Amino acid sequence: MSNSNNVLKLGLPKGSLQDSTLELFANAGFHFSVQSRSYFPSIDDDELEAILIRAQEMARYVSQGAFDAGLTGKDWIIETDADVVEVADLVYSKASMRPVRWVLAVPESSPIQSVRDLEGKHIATEVVNITKKYLARNGVNASVEFSWGATEVKPPELADAIVEVTETGSSLRANKLRIVETILESNTKLIANKASWENPWKREKIENMAMLLQGAINAQGKVGLKMNAPKAGLNKLIESIPALRQPTISDLADNAWVAIEVIVDEKVVRHLIPDLKRAGAEGIFEYDINKLID
């Protein structure tokens, strides 16, 4: 058990990931309140202190011990060469529940078709180290310039190509850019300072947090269904349910009936409930799931 002196310093990503991160934590059971222009959210957990900071800087600060743990992308761990413990993969991003990609992109009219066509060219990017390593792996000599933002507008006048992050590619297409290659796929990770990870209390706190966050991600797009069904024809009814796991079946006072509970993808419910009703199920109700722990 912890005492009031035990506090875990947690870094949360500010910017594009902030809203989706706070929503994920809320689903995991941690409720933050962020005041306007404040970088210090309040939290309904006396054992946590949180600070909002850019994901690009997170791994460095966790490595240095400014934070015990934090959330940042795999890309920024690689870019900053941070020496941290990678506790858990948390596959979510600002607009979806899938990884993002760092891609090599050029103007639609560019003759560049592969990385080897970049010999002697100029590239703009926010991930200079990742890009230089990518060029070195492919034996290409090109200049790489750090971009402070709005990287998509730089080709062709200010750069021959860019290395930029994308979820859907829509921003690149809107700026008339074409993806040549994917350099790196990245997802959010929960990371820990190495010394903090060796502290038993902090490690348990971080591991518990990781479990709950992963459970919240697992529950995305899932709902629970409960119903009563007659034993007659039960096997056929069960076979019609596209469940993640075998349904839980419990006996009722009426020996001719059973109670069924199951977790399914929310997208199938609008078709599934009418099918279940026609198959003889009664008292069907649907409920939300915040966490699904394997």
UniProtKB/Swiss-Prot annotation:
Cofactor(s) of this protein: Mg(2+)
Catalytic activity: 1-(5-phospho-beta-D-ribosyl)-ATP + diphosphate = 5-phospho-alpha-D-ribose 1-diphosphate + ATP
Subcellular location: Cytoplasm
InterPro entries: ATP-PRT_HisG_long (IPR020621), ATP_PRibTrfase_cat (IPR013820), ATP_PRibTrfase_HisG (IPR001348), HisG_C (IPR013115), N-reg_PII-like_a/b (IPR011322), N-reg_PII/ATP_PRibTrfase_C (IPR015867)
BP GO terms, sorted: L-histidine biosynthetic process
Record pathway: Amino-acid biosynthesis; L-histidine biosynthesis; L-histidine from 5-phospho-alpha-D-ribose 1-diphosphate: step 1/9
Entry's EC annotation: 2.4.2.17
Enzyme class: transferase
Keyword ATP-binding: yes
GO molecular function: ATP binding; ATP phosphoribosyltransferase activity; magnesium ion binding
Keyword line: Amino-acid biosynthesis, ATP-binding, Cytoplasm, Glycosyltransferase, Histidine biosynthesis, Magnesium, Metal-binding, Nucleotide-binding, Transferase
A Pfam cross-reference name: HisG
Activity regulation info: Feedback inhibited by histidine.
Keyword Nucleotidyltransferase: no
Protein family membership: Belongs to the ATP phosphoribosyltransferase family. Long subfamily.
UniProt function note: Catalyzes the condensation of ATP and 5-phosphoribose 1-diphosphate to form N'-(5'-phosphoribosyl)-ATP (PR-ATP). Has a crucial role in the pathway because the rate of histidine biosynthesis seems to be controlled primarily by regulation of HisG enzymatic activity.
Protein name: ATP phosphoribosyltransferase
